Amino acid sequence: MTGNELEIELKEPLLPVEEYLAAGVHIGTQQKSKDMMKFIYRVRGDGLYILDIQATDERIKTAAKFLSQYEPSKILVVTSRQYGQYPAKKFADAIGGMAVVGRFIPGMLTNQRLHGLNKYIEPDVVVVTDPIGDSQTIAEAVQVGIPIVALCDTNNMTKYVDVVIPTNNKGRKALSVIYYLLTKELLRLRGVATSLTPEDFETEL
């Protein structure tokens, strides 16, 4: 493979830009954090901050490569967001990981007394859907030294996040697309073919 061919491969998006836009992956909030400034493309007339799709695409690849270092069964995905629950569970099922959707019980990562109740889990890496909604998970992961991958919107703080995926982390279609691409890329890196589509990750209204 020549240098030019390698460059083309690295820059080839996981999804056409039009499909990212159609899913609203780039639509942020009307707030921005200092941490997320480098991922913001522009601000719209209505005050909404717009994320850089190229950065999103690159960070999905980075996150997948990072996660590929871990045993699938030791990857935990967490989401308290309603629209994140179905795609997060689908992600976990597809890669052979663990999922906690809905309420995260305090102590799940730190209190071994919950082990007898089948509530204590010991992942090697955690994926969270929203650093705000999943703040308890992040606090516990930091406490026990577990690396964190997070889907971060324009208003999120990323202080304790090891790998940031800049994205709309509230929209139904956006979350389904992100988890689909993360699944597909992670499986590809492991040499596993998949027939999954973005629609397979999309929860019903």
Curated annotation (Swiss-Prot):
One GO-annotated biological process of the protein: translation
InterPro entries the record matches: Ribosomal_uS2, Ribosomal_uS2_arc, Ribosomal_uS2_CS, Ribosomal_uS2_euk/arc, Ribosomal_uS2_flav_dom_sf
Domain of life, source organism: Archaea
Gene Ontology molecular function terms on file: structural constituent of ribosome
One Pfam family named in its UniProt record: Ribosomal_S2
GO CC terms of this entry: small ribosomal subunit
Family membership noted in the UniProt record: Belongs to the universal ribosomal protein uS2 family.
Name the record gives this protein: Small ribosomal subunit protein uS2
Protein's organism: Methanoculleus marisnigri (strain ATCC 35101 / DSM 1498 / JR1)
